[in-house]
Amino acid sequence: MPSGNDIAARLARLDWPAIERSLWAWGYAKTPAVLTASECAELIGLYADEARFRSTVDMARYKFGVGEYKYFTAPLPPLVDALRHAAYPPLAAIANQWEAALDTATAHPPTLDGLRAVCHRRGQTKPTPLLLHYETGGYNCLHQDLYGDVVFPLQLTCFLSRRETDYTGGDFLLVEQRPRAQSRGESIAPAQGEMVIFATRYRPVEGARGIYRGAMRHGVSRITSGSRYTLGVIFHDAK
């Protein structure tokens, strides 16, 4: 696995002004590959190691979709921990701009450790990064990843499997609910190692009467063949 400094350097090389523009315009941004093929394979390999996880969810049981996901236990794998720590500061700067635009009273700490301290004071102490796995016919219903009162406005998904090689179908879906209008959808098909950064719950949207709160949900379209793995990185912890 790479060092934390290596992951931080890769993230620092991303075009953050372009990411910020895309997040403001559409509520999401897709990056070039951040993880290598071997790193993706190593993360997929962790899925069978039950000692790495605090919880396993059969999605069909709860009518969340068809598939399975597992929440990592503490301590997180070094790559996941490094990614979570390094991605947070630039996203916190954007998140605070969003909060100001929406005229909330929320200011997110500049570091992940600061956010997690806020979470822990509110009873949210469980790590939320997770691995998700779908086989042919699997899908994920539209949802939001909320685990308590503390909600960081942005999260990311890393795509570990090779599209058109390991699986087909399985687009990443985003739907924005607009006031007094029909919902707007996006279908995104990232390659292995790429990330999608997206709104967790709300985003500021410029409307005819000023800024309004656009509600966002995300999901996964049906996998038509093969096996699809992703890494989800949520920054707030869970109750």
Task: State where each predicted segment sits.
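Fe(II)/2-oxoglutarate oxygenase catalytic core
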Residues: 1-155, 160-239
